[in-house]
Curated annotation (Swiss-Prot):
The keyword Disulfide bond applies. Disulfide bonds join 41-104. Residues 22-41 are annotated as: Framework-1. Residues 66-72 are annotated as: Complementarity-determining-2. Residues 42-49 are annotated as: Complementarity-determining-1. Residues 73-104 are annotated as: Framework-3. Residues 50-65 are annotated as: Framework-2. Pfam families: V-set. Keywords: Adaptive immunity, Disulfide bond, Immunity, Immunoglobulin, Signal. Residues 105-113 are annotated as: Complementarity-determining-3. This is Ig lambda chain V-1 region.
Length: 113
């Protein structure tokens, strides 16, 4: 059986400071169901979050906050990491339902501080 690739669009987004930082993300990522997808976001902030928006105009859902923390309602296939100035969202075993726009956000301080 052939699988149709997913298109996972990603957009950079900043928050948490009056000074706008430049965040760099790929414009889009495609994958086949079951594959592992890594989306990166580079900038100069200490903390990053990842957000998923499935339909235009709908509220984004927080997938990851403070680099690595996942809300309890988010599936474990979503994980976050940070190395140096680059944050990474990893989707392990991507599903068709994961097709969405993914936003990266950054801040100078932890959201739980």
């Amino acid at each position: 059986m052939a699988w149709a690739p997913l298109l996972l669009a990603v957009l950079a987004h900043t928050s948490g400071s009056l000074v706008q930082a430049a965040l760099t993300q790929p414009s889009s990522v495609s994958a086949n169901p079951g594959e592992t997808v890594k989306i990166t976001c580079s900038g100069d902030r200490s903390y990053y979050g990842w957000y998923q928006q499935k339909a235009p105009g709908s509220a984004p859902v927080t997938l990851i906050y403070d680099n690595t923390n996942r809300p309890s309602n988010i599936p474990s296939r979503f994980s976050g990491s940070k190395s140096g100035s680059t944050a990474t969202l990893t989707i392990t075993g991507v599903q068709a339902d994961d097709e969405a726009v993914y936003y990266c956000g950054s801040a100078d301080s932890s959201s739980t501080a």
